[in-house]
Amino acid sequence: MLRFETAGESHGECLVATMNGLPAGIPISLETVNRELWRRQQGYGRGGRMKIETDKAEIVAGVRHSRTIGAPLAIIIRNKDWQNWTEILPVEDAGSGADRKPVTRPRPGHADLAGAIKYNFHDARYILERASARETTARVAVGAIAKALLAEFGIQVLSHVIAVGSVRLERAASWDELVALSLRDQVLLGCVDAETEARMKEVVDEAYRTGDTVGGVFEVVARGLPIGLGSHVTWDSRLDGRLAQAIVSMQAVKGVEVGFAAEGAASFGSKVQDTIHYDREAHHFTRGANRAGGIEGGMTNGQDILVRGMLKPISTLRRPLESVDLLTREPSPAAYERSDVCVVPAAGVIGEAMVAIVLAQAFLEKFGGDSLTETRRNFDSYLEQVKNY
């Protein structure tokens, strides 16, 4: 089973990720991993932290001569901002006189209050340091490794932004547009339509002017998947459920949609289901549409997977909302921590990583293999079975 974990705080020395269960022989390019980290840092509306950090992955275990060796893989990403926090967040006790930059005025919408109560802290600093979306840097690095595995079998995962605030892309994006978007050297708001993107920018500008933040919707598309990843047999093996959990695990994501779920909920069944056809010349089944988003009964059906994440606006506001001081219990404006105005494009990149990780897990559950050669042999055998069905 492919597993991963992350560790590290927002202003700690580094972020760490480990992966276990990768077959030996997967080609790994640090340049590609770092490109994914760069993409996560881009986007109109990002805050000052992105001007400090230049995220680079260091693979310290599990890869030799640019290929996985079947051992646990470990990645470190160092925080440049750590140099400004060494005396504030030391590992060893710095004494009672140390400046800890305490956070005693929890921010509505963040983990501050619930976390402080749960872990019995009267300083929410220790909660927000781990709850911060800075943690997703490590997830994106893990996702880049998962993408490398999937790419060996012709599977690609891309994303784009379909809404910022009330401005929404009103047409479908082509695969070629998504590829071109992923190759951009300058990321604005991650929308494939220039006119729509310009209107999205106006929304972000308005939020900035008023000391506010803005959310939106991103879509992740996965192409090239075989029929049959996931299962209908148990509740927790259903692939759409696993993808939904992965997307909602992202900071600020409050909703998820697989396929055209919201549209389908307002329609009749005869207008929603994807009709089944058979191409006798090509000897395979085809579908009349893809409203299901590539998953039926918890299993891939061979079409593109479509998953959307809905982000609430970032919780940290330059014009703070009402809160209460944890120490005095008196009303007080919420604390302010350096933050972003809009993170929807970055969330799309993180969403790609989460989808790629879940798909890589499902792929290895289906095809197994201690080496890439063995995995490929199992995969090819299954494709032959599907072809001869």
Curated annotation (Swiss-Prot):
<comment type="subunit">
    <text>Homotetramer.</text>
</comment>
<feature type="binding site">
    <location>
        <position position="40"/>
    </location>
    <ligand>
        <name>NADP(+)</name>
    </ligand>
</feature>
<feature type="binding site">
    <location>
        <position position="46"/>
    </location>
    <ligand>
        <name>NADP(+)</name>
    </ligand>
</feature>
<keyword id="KW-0028">Amino-acid biosynthesis</keyword>
<dbReference type="GO" id="GO:0010181">
    <property type="term" value="F:FMN binding"/>
</dbReference>
<keyword id="KW-0456">Lyase</keyword>
<comment type="pathway">
    <text>Metabolic intermediate biosynthesis; chorismate biosynthesis; chorismate from D-erythrose 4-phosphate and phosphoenolpyruvate: step 7/7.</text>
</comment>
<dbReference type="InterPro" id="IPR000453">
    <property type="entry name" value="Chorismate_synth"/>
</dbReference>
<dbReference type="GO" id="GO:0009073">
    <property type="term" value="P:aromatic amino acid family biosynthetic process"/>
</dbReference>
<protein>
    <recommendedName>
        <fullName>Chorismate synthase</fullName>
        <ecNumber>4.2.3.5</ecNumber>
    </recommendedName>
</protein>
<dbReference type="InterPro" id="IPR020541">
    <property type="entry name" value="Chorismate_synthase_CS"/>
</dbReference>
<feature type="binding site">
    <location>
        <position position="338"/>
    </location>
    <ligand>
        <name>FMN</name>
    </ligand>
</feature>
<dbReference type="InterPro" id="IPR035904">
    <property type="entry name" value="Chorismate_synth_AroC_sf"/>
</dbReference>
<dbReference type="Pfam" id="PF01264">
    <property type="entry name" value="Chorismate_synt"/>
</dbReference>
<keyword id="KW-0274">FAD</keyword>
<keyword id="KW-0057">Aromatic amino acid biosynthesis</keyword>
<feature type="binding site">
    <location>
        <position position="297"/>
    </location>
    <ligand>
        <name>FMN</name>
    </ligand>
</feature>
<keyword id="KW-0288">FMN</keyword>
<keyword id="KW-0521">NADP</keyword>
<dbReference type="GO" id="GO:0008652">
    <property type="term" value="P:amino acid biosynthetic process"/>
</dbReference>
<feature type="binding site">
    <location>
        <begin position="130"/>
        <end position="132"/>
    </location>
    <ligand>
        <name>FMN</name>
    </ligand>
</feature>
<comment type="function">
    <text>This reaction introduces a second double bond into the aromatic ring system.</text>
</comment>
<comment type="similarity">
    <text>Belongs to the chorismate synthase family.</text>
</comment>
<feature type="binding site">
    <location>
        <begin position="251"/>
        <end position="252"/>
    </location>
    <ligand>
        <name>FMN</name>
    </ligand>
</feature>
<feature type="binding site">
    <location>
        <begin position="312"/>
        <end position="316"/>
    </location>
    <ligand>
        <name>FMN</name>
    </ligand>
</feature>
<dbReference type="GO" id="GO:0005829">
    <property type="term" value="C:cytosol"/>
</dbReference>
<keyword id="KW-0285">Flavoprotein</keyword>
<dbReference type="GO" id="GO:0004107">
    <property type="term" value="F:chorismate synthase activity"/>
</dbReference>
<dbReference type="GO" id="GO:0009423">
    <property type="term" value="P:chorismate biosynthetic process"/>
</dbReference>
